[in-house]
Structure formats: C-alpha cells, structure tokens
From Swiss-Prot:
It is an enzyme of class 4 (lyase). The gene is moaC. It holds the Pfam family MoaC. This is Cyclic pyranopterin monophosphate synthase. Belongs to the MoaC family. Homohexamer; trimer of dimers.
Amino acid sequence: MSQLTHLDDSGAAHMVDVGGKPATERLARAGGTIRMSAEALAAIKAGDAPKGDVLGTARIAGIMAAKKTGELIPLCHPLALDAVDVAFEFGEREIAVTATASLTGKTGVEMEALTAASVALLTIYDMAKALDKGMVIEGLRLLEKRGGKSGHWIAK
C-alpha cells in the first residue's frame, strides 16, 4: 500500500524491524540558525547573558536531547550513540548551530542530529530571551547523512 517504512500494508503505524539489518557506520549532521539583536549576540559572545553560559548550556542540552530522541519521537529506535557534537558559528546577527551524531548500528541517526540541533537552538532562545524576545529560529534541516542503504547524501 505505502512506500513509507513506518506504515504496514493496512496503513497502520508501526516500528520498523531492523533486527535483520547489518550494523554499519552511520553519521548525520543537522543544523539551523537563531537570529537575534546585535546586543543579544554581543552578550552571548562575551559570556554576559543574565542566565550564564548560553553556548555551554546549549551544547549540553543538544547532546542530552540526541540521547533522548527515541523517547521523544514516536517509532524512533532508541540508539546507543557513539558520539554527538554540537558546534556554533557566529554570524553578523545570528548563531548557526550544527549537530553531528554517529554510531555503528542498524538504523540512521538523522533524527538524533535534528533533535540535538533543535534543542540547542531552543536552549539559546531560553537562555537569552531576557535580552531579545524577538529571536527567530529558522532553517532547521538535515545537512548530511552517511551509511545505510541510501549511502551518502549532502543537502544542496
């Protein structure tokens, strides 16, 4: 009936059985951006935000979120991640967040990378909202994936 792997022949949702698949090296990178006022960005860069170390807290939040993805996203397998990295890059009025997740396993880590990036962005908002309530989170997307049946993919 459907080509979606999370639906059975009758259209009902189910968790995909990955038991028979071989374990392979897998990696996913995801990212997004949070735009803000110049003042808020300067405070974050200087470590002067009222709530403390914004980027350090956002990094830990992103890593924790990646580890909890199987609990947050229905039908997503709980995974034993080998590594998660959350990196930040400053722009003129924004911070770009890139999260990378990897493992050797039977299913991909795209959702873990996306969850890490989104929660890191949300944490930046939470930690800096006293400085700028009008911050805008945008462009959350998968940037790259490696491994598995579909091979290597890079966003255009």
